[in-house]
Curated annotation (Swiss-Prot):
Potent inhibitor of voltage-dependent potassium channels, with a preference for Kv1.3/KCNA3 versus Kv1.2/KCNA2. It comes from Androctonus amoreuxi (African fattail scorpion). Belongs to the short scorpion toxin superfamily. Potassium channel inhibitor family. Alpha-KTx 03 subfamily. Keywords: Amidation, Disulfide bond, Ion channel impairing toxin, Neurotoxin, Potassium channel impairing toxin, Secreted, Toxin, Voltage-gated potassium channel impairing toxin. It comes from the Eukaryota. One of its GO terms (cellular component) is extracellular region. This is Potassium channel toxin alpha-KTx 3.12.
């Protein structure tokens, strides 16, 4: 995935930031959001 500069404690927190970044499937890895490009 693509790491974005958004801190997180759970993957659910990455859904919106990833959508806002034009991507999908947010996952929280090492307290940072990682997104899957469309």
């Amino acid at each position: 995935g693509v790491e974005i500069n958004v801190k997180c404690t759970g993957s659910h927190q990455c859904i919106k930031p990833c959508k806002d970044a034009g991507m999908r499937f947010g996952k929280c890895i090492n307290r940072k959001c990682h997104c899957t490009p469309k």
